[in-house]
């Protein structure tokens, strides 16, 4: 009879708690706490994460490198200017006129010149020139043939820019994956807290009514102690969840680059945002089609990055060949100098041919090394392409397993609800103990938590699958 009385008091509260646990999570408005959806969290992370900013800076640097390589197609114009003033003339010599006069000329000069002049001709004369001067030139050189180094250098710079873009895409995938993992971890903990709240409400009502029954002498005090022990366990779980929610919220806020809330004392900051939780108990999570239309290894940024590595190795090989070929250039210049206190200008055109000779020996080994590196890149592409296919299949298997686990978790909730209902009836009929009813409640709580974990895991597996097939 006493069990029947208690069961009448508990029946309404049990179903009320079950309804609270099963209701999809939603957040009220007007609380002053900013709410973020999953897409907003990922968008914020993609805009503020340091890895993404670094990858974007790398793209800008690669663009400038490509533009720098493009300038090699145009003439190289250079100007040179020089002024000097030496302590003495740079061109000095001594001339002895007597050594330059033949005997016949000397006899004629002796008849024509005075004695003083003839004596001067016999003395050496010192000549000094170019003590100071000015030189200037303006040159333009246009490469005509450089062994393909300019063309291949530009292609290599373009490959470098493409590589940076692919690396950005990989960074975005990683940031998106991590942000979504944090999001679902926080959502899972908050959903478990909602379950704790519902169970705590149920246990408080059970405690109140069992306490009344004990005072009335229709229930044993042992039943009341069992309820109190379960309440203590729930409070312990609540403390752990509160700490976990706080830590994960801090991690998510920092990773997504959200603005922290400064404390009133100004001694620290914390994140006070919240997330918009999905309805985890709805039956609208359908299994996607395997390897949907357009899915393929060649669409993956990892494969494209390896393909760019092969292309870069091939261009490096061509550059090595070009460095050992003759180079031809033509040019024109305009020059000015004033070395003998006389301004002089002139223009000229020229052509140059540069042929590496001794470099051929070492260059031949460089070419062979580049060929080997190119072959290695091709083999690595083929090997990793197979690994990427395996990753795609593994990701699909993970989605299938997570989906099946989710369906099992949903069925477990239904079975746990029925088990709780039966134990309530058994307790009312006096054929079950309070420990059995509390055990049924615990099984229901565990089923809800497993469903929450299964739902979060399914969402993470879906993202991994989309990234694995290049979507």
Write out the residue ranges for each language-model feature.
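A glycine-/polar-enriched beta->alpha junction
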Residues: 43-53, 60-75, 126-130, 138-155, ...
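Amphipathic alpha-helical coiled-coil segments
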Residues: 54-69, 171, 177-194, 205, ...
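Small/polar, glycine/serine/threonine/aspartate-rich low-complexity segments that form flexible
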Residues: 80-139, 272-273, 277-282, 331-366
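Acidic, low-complexity, intrinsically disordered peripheral segments
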Residues: 6, 78, 85-101, 260-263, ...
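Periplasmic alpha-helical coiled-coil/stalk elements that build and connect Gram-negative outer-membrane
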Residues: 36, 40, 64-66, 166-287, ...
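Bacterial Sec-pathway N-terminal export signals of envelope proteins
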Residues: 20-90, 218-219, 256-314, 318, ...
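Sec-dependent N-terminal signal peptides
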Residues: 4-13
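Positively charged n-region of N-terminal signal peptides that target proteins for export
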Residues: 1-4, 20
């Amino acid at each position: 009879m006493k069990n029947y009385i208690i069961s009448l008091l508990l029946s309404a509260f049990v179903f009320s708690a079950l309804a609270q646990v099963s209701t999809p999570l939603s957040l009220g408005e007007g609380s002053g706490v900013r709410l973020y959806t999953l897409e907003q969290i990922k968008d914020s992370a993609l805009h503020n994460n340091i890895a993404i900013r670094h990858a974007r800076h790398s793209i800008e640097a690669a663009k400038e490198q490509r533009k720098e390589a493009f300038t090699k197609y145009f003439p190289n114009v250079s100007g040179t200017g020089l002024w000097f003033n030496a302590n003495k003339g740079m061109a000095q010599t001594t001339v002895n006129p007597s050594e330059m006069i033949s005997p016949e000329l000397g006899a004629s000069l002796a008849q024509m010149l005075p004695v003083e002049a003839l004596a001067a001709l016999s003395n050496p004369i010192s000549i000094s020139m170019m003590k100071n001067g000015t030189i200037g030139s303006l040159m333009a050189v246009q490469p005509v043939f450089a062994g393909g180094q300019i063309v291949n250098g530009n292609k290599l710079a373009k490959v470098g820019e493409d590589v940076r873009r692919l690396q950005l895409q990989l960074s975005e995938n990683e940031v998106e994956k991590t942000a979504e993992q944090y999001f679902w971890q926080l959502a899972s903990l908050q959903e478990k807290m909602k379950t704790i709240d519902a169970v705590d409400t149920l246990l408080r009502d059970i405690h109140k009514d069992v306490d009344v029954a004990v005072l009335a002498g229709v229930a044993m005090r042992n039943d009341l102690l069992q309820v109190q022990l379960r309440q203590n366990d729930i409070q312990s779980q609540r403390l752990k969840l509160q700490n976990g929610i706080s830590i994960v919220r801090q991690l998510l806020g920092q990773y997504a680059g959200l603005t922290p809330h400064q404390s009133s004392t100004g001694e620290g900051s914390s994140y006070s945002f919240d997330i918009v939780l999905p309805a985890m108990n709805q039956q609208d999570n359908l299994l996607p089609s395997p390897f949907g239309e357009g899915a393929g290894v060649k669409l993956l940024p990892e494969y494209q990055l390896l393909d760019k590595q092969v292309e870069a190795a091939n261009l490096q090989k061509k550059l090595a060949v070009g460095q050992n070929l003759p180079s031809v250039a033509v040019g024109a210049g305009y020059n000015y100098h004033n070395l003998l206190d006389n301004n002089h200008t002139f223009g000229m055109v020229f052509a140059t041919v540069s042929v590496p000779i001794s470099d051929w020996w070492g260059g031949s080994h460089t070419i062979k090394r580049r060929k080997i590196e190119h072959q290695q890149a091709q083999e690595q592409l083929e090997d990793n392409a197979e690994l990427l296919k395996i990753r795609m299949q593994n990701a699909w298997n993970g989605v299938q397993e997570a989906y099946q686990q989710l369906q099992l978790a949903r069925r477990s909730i239904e079975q746990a609800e029925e088990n709780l209902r039966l134990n309530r009836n058994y307790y009312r009929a006096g054929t079950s103990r309070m420990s059995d009813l509390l055990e049924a409640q615990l099984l229901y709580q565990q089923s809800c938590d497993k469903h929450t974990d299964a739902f979060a895991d399914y969402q993470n597996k879906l993202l991994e699958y989309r990234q694995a097939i290049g979507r």
